[in-house]
């Protein structure tokens, strides 16, 4: 497992450094000059998780150690009566078997993330883990915030929320370079192809 984590971190380091122009070349890079802000990553935990839980995962610890030039901001899902505890948005009212067509279902979290970006941004990238992946794609599709990179780990699209999914599909392809990762034994492995489609 440590070998897989190390290989993923090496790949991430190459992905980030290549696309930011940090290739060791003395020549100026268009990509390196395109982003002038600090290298901050907005990280979204999974449903039922927490910022501390995501931050404490061994793979995340390795990633932060391997990328000391990046600052990671771990957002906490808003605490709201309409949502489950530590979730970015609630399950559909009729359960996951009955897709929810409400296009505003994640507005509380979108507004919350807008506030985070305004107070702590700008952010170079957005990272989502599990339910943080669909929230990241919903946020990219429904806000005026732009990111250079998206890192989507073990996630999926909000297909049980057809209204939210429609807001993503209407603006697809999303204008952000993305690294999408899914583990072979992950219950959400189907999400890799879904996410790659937007």
List each language-model region with its residue ranges:
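Secretory targeting signatures
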Residues: 1-34
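Serine-hydrolase catalytic machinery in alpha/beta-hydrolase-like enzymes
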Residues: 38-123
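The conserved beta1-alpha1 loop
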Residues: 42-47, 154, 182-183
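Short alpha-helix in the alpha/beta-hydrolase fold that links the catalytic acid
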Residues: 55-60, 164-165, 189-198
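Active-site nucleophile loop of the alpha/beta-hydrolase fold
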Residues: 77-78, 150-159, 185
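Gly/Ala-rich beta-loop-alpha elbow adjacent to hydrolase catalytic centers
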Residues: 124-136
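Acidic catalytic loop of the alpha/beta-hydrolase fold
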Residues: 158-159, 182-190, 195
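Short beta-strand/loop motif that positions the catalytic acidic residue
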Residues: 174, 179-182
